[in-house]
Amino acid sequence: MFAPRVFLSMIGALAAFAVATYYLNGSLASTAIQTLICAVLIQVGYFIAVLFLVWKEARERRRLSSQKQFMTAEAANDEKQPGKVSLRRLNRPHHLNS
């Protein structure tokens, strides 16, 4: 969500809302109040959308971090077990079987 585009779109939507409200009510005071309420609701929606995007990104980073830790721990366990040969060590370029 590109902020300047969102704000310009918000201003356009509020202007259209204000024109329609004034056309329906004919009252400038009522139009101003209803447009202000609409602006607050749009801002709350934008704030919730940004919070959702941040939450989603944080959740994805935590998931990737936990997978990375699991893979690192698994590789460390492969290296430490005495009877088990790690495929990672066999695939090294300086290994004699190459």
Swiss-Prot record:
Name of the protein: Exopolysaccharide production repressor protein
Name of the encoding gene: exoX
Any Pfam family: SyrA
Involved pathway(s): Glycan metabolism; exopolysaccharide biosynthesis
Listed transmembrane segments: 6-26, 35-55
Keywords: Cell membrane, Exopolysaccharide synthesis, Membrane, Nodulation, Plasmid, Transmembrane, Transmembrane helix
Function of the molecule: Inhibition of exopolysaccharide synthesis (EPS) and nodulation ability (NOD).
A Gene Ontology biological process term: polysaccharide biosynthetic process
Compartments (UniProt record): Cell membrane
GO cellular component: plasma membrane
Membrane topology: Multi-pass membrane protein
Organism: Rhizobium meliloti (strain 1021) (Ensifer meliloti)
